[in-house]
């Protein structure tokens, strides 16, 4: 959760910087520019319960992280002279779908297997991880964005820094995906295989 939220808060922060500082969007237009992500996020989140019953939390979480990763990598390629539609809006669609698909399974996985008497404490840990991901993740990405590109200035410099930060955010998502596959998806597949063998 720390890695995922760190990458996502970086996405919101640096994409806003890109839209206002590079594409010269006003604040109101910048807010509207996030609509592709918001609408897809809402639509996907509405069908998460059905998807969870069909595919399980682990697979759904891995798929959501994969979509977010693909969108973040795509968005990180935006430069000072690329268009909103192909460099921002379409990656946002992937990120919105990934967020809508991942957030609920991410929370569920954080408290899965916890005894009923410890559910409150587990929920608290999940929320702490959420807040730490926001603050620490953004701090790391801002520090990474400030490195290099001494020869650039103006819009070109800002676009470079946004791209650098989003690339680092992509690395955080890739690491989160590896953790999910190793600690959530694979153990559940093994448990299902053992259960199937026992029933046979």
Which residues are covered by each model-predicted region?
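Transmembrane core module of solute transporters
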Residues: 1-107, 115-117, 169-170
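Residue-level recognition of specific faces of alpha-helices
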Residues: 5, 11, 121-125, 143, ...
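Transmembrane helix-loop junctions in multipass membrane proteins, especially transporters and channels
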Residues: 50-54, 80-84, 147-154, 184-192
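Loop-to-transmembrane-helix entry motif
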Residues: 6, 33, 128-135, 162-169
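Transmembrane-helix exit segments and adjacent C-terminal regions of multi-pass membrane proteins
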Residues: 97, 108-109, 155-200
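Membrane-embedded alpha-helical segments of multi-pass transporters/permeases
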Residues: 73-77, 135, 139, 143, ...
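Small-residue-rich alpha-helical segments with characteristic i,i+4
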Residues: 88-157
């Amino acid at each position: 959760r720390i890695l995922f939220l760190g990458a996502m808060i970086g996405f919101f922060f640096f994409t806003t910087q890109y839209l206002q500082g590079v594409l010269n969007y006003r604040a109101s237009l910048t807010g509207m520019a996030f609509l592709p992500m918001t609408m897809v996020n809402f639509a996907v989140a509405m069908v998460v319960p059905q998807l969870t019953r069909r595919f399980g939390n682990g697979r759904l979480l891995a798929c959501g992280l994969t979509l977010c990763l693909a969108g973040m990598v795509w968005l990180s390629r935006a430069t000072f002279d690329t268009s909103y539609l192909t460099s921002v809006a379409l990656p946002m669609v992937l990120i919105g779908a990934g967020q809508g698909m991942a957030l609920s399974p991410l929370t569920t996985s954080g408290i899965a297997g916890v005894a009923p008497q410890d559910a409150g404490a587990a929920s608290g840990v999940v929320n702490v991880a959420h807040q730490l991901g926001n603050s620490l993740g953004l701090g790391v990405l801002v520090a990474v964005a400030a490195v290099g590109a001494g020869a650039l200035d103006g819009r070109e410099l800002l676009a470079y820094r946004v791209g650098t930060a989003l690339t680092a955010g992509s690395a955080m998502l890739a690491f989160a995906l590896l953790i999910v596959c190793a600690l959530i998806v694979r153990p559940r597949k093994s448990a299902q295989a053992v259960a199937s063998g026992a029933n046979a």
